[in-house]
């Protein structure tokens, strides 16, 4: 089994918790949640800068696709990832 980067494991756990209470959301709300929870490295991204915004977007999408694959392996949830909406649903 693949071992995760320690940063990614923490992000996936926090995303799973967040989606448990907000099954339909968007990328901005996810990033703001990760920043509010001080999840590294999101706590250091400055969304007002192009580099910070890109880094937050890239890492958020990367983590969401890892979470989607995890949900598929566990046959637990489906995760729909669109440019303006993210939705978790029971299978």
Indicate residue ranges for each PLM-predicted region.
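Short "pre-J" leader segments immediately N-terminal to J/J-like domains in DnaJ-family
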Residues: 2-91
